[in-house]
């Protein structure tokens, strides 16, 4: 049995999970689905202000509410748990954070083998690190990490994701491609399910992550991840700056949230292109191979 806990707004994360699990279901493995439903509702498409107002709590790991009760009956002896979600503001989404902080979830995941699947734009590193820390704290055993990401250039994907998040327009239009993970990439995600199926059959999860990586489970883009690491640090300062004016949905912090929005526009469309150019000019100095091993592989003692 494999249990899939998932959070999705647009349906993309669920599409990814279904495709990964298809080979398992076809082989006779029981796949049990459990949606993660936050007590605090998050709209989709988003209102612009509400989306950016959720930033400080997302970055600081302070979800404003918990999740609806989950049904754990009949899944106690699952051979594998898959957790599927997405990144918000270079961190796990607030519903994912609420999920990991739930006491029943902690008790259930203790000792379980876990694969984390992230369907995101193109910055997944800090989310992966946060999830890894959550799982380590509750004594779960992370055996896999899969990232399906938007393959469009960074600035293009920023435009398409805003169009999708705020206006609900996923389809290609004018000169912009469709937003999100490409349909072909979602369809091809079944190859990860084939690898997971063999691991379950052999009860051998020690080599699962290297096998997933060999199949393309993570497309490692060092210049983007350098931007992410820098952005994550700066986001921490901004999150504290905004929260000094109030907590989640406090109208007193509206001005600071709006300032952050314009700061983000400048970073995305002015600063980041030059930062990427600088990275490529200094590429030999960045020890990319070492960082890739640290960022993509999972220690066997997790």
Indicate residue ranges for each PLM-predicted region:
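A polyampholytic, Gly/Pro-enriched intrinsically disordered region
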Residues: 55-58, 133-141, 161-174
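A short secondary-structure junction signal
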Residues: 94-95, 126-129, 157
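Short, surface-exposed basic-aromatic patches at helix termini and helix-loop junctions that form
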Residues: 22, 97-111, 129-140
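N-terminal beta1-alpha1-beta2 submodule of the flavodoxin-like/Rossmannoid cofactor-binding fold
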Residues: 1-85, 90-95, 101, 109-110, ...
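Glycine-rich phosphate/pyrophosphate-binding loop and the adjoining helix
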Residues: 153-230
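Short, glycine-/small-residue-rich phosphate/pyrophosphate-handling segment
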Residues: 113-153
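A short acidic, often aromatic-flanked loop/helix-cap motif at beta-alpha or helix-coil junctions
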Residues: 39-43, 150-155
